Amino acid sequence: MPFLMELFGKVESWHEKLYLHLSKPFFRRAFYLTKKIFIYNEIVLFFFQKNMISKNMTVGEIVAKNVAFAEIFEKYGIDFCCGGDVSFIEICEKNNLDAEKIIAELQNLPEKQSADHDFENFDLGDLADYIVDVHHTFVRENIPRIDEYLNKICRVHGENHPELFGVLENYEAVREELLAHMPKEENVLFPYIHRLVDAEKNNIAPAKPPFGTVKNPIRMMEMEHDNAGDATKNIRNLTNNFTLPEDACNSYRITFELLENFEKDLHVHIHLENNILFPKAIALEEKLWNA
């Protein structure tokens, strides 16, 4: 007690004593430093937990933690969109990949995903809007350019590289699939997902849609995703992973760049729907109907 008397002095209450004590410059600095250390540790723990990966997780679940992981999976040819429901270890064993090496690469990848793009925690309505604004827009903007360049190199180089006609056939298949697919999402499925979100916010049960349950259009969308995914795989195989031949001109190079970027965008597009938006929409509908 004599120490406390010496430390605090003679003041009326312990609140005043503590305030005066912490007001001293030394203790203010110590308190501020302790607070910074605590916040830093919380941030480190958040990113450690966010990027914790188990071999038994599905590849879709892994990319859902951080969409930046997609570029590592792309490098190893791991299908995380249409094949996102397969476990990571199963894919590694099937394709003779070093699981430990890939996990190390994933965990050492710089955090590229800002809070604005933490898709796993997006509001479902906002995620649907994001898919339309970013990925549907990307498809519609790039189709005319790919049409122009791909048809051009088929005319100029098709005789020496007949595989280009197979590329064109598969590209036209995925193009038509997407041009029919996107309006179904924009006009039927996504508006219903918005209604589910609004119903949850207002604590009411949503009216049953004419298609019965959200599972029905989702099942159709996933089948169409599979078709588009198969066509892009065929394109990658026909082009030997977009490898340019020795006689490739600038138009050839631009075409392959456009096709590869189209494929990468489609992979993320399908991942956001198959592995995040669709499962959560199904769970939300079931929760609201069973409430």
Question: What does each of the following model-derived ranges do?
Answer:
Residues 1-10:
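Extreme N-terminal basic, low-complexity initiation segments
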Residues 17, 35-37, 43, 50:
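Polybasic, lysine-rich low-complexity intrinsically disordered segments
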Residues 44-291:
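Small-residue-biased structural context
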Residues 10, 31-33, 38:
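Juxtamembrane/membrane-water interface recognition
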Residues 4, 20-22, 27-28, 32-33:
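Short hydrophobic targeting helices and cationic amphipathic motifs
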Residues 10, 24-25, 221, 232:
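General helical secondary-structure elements
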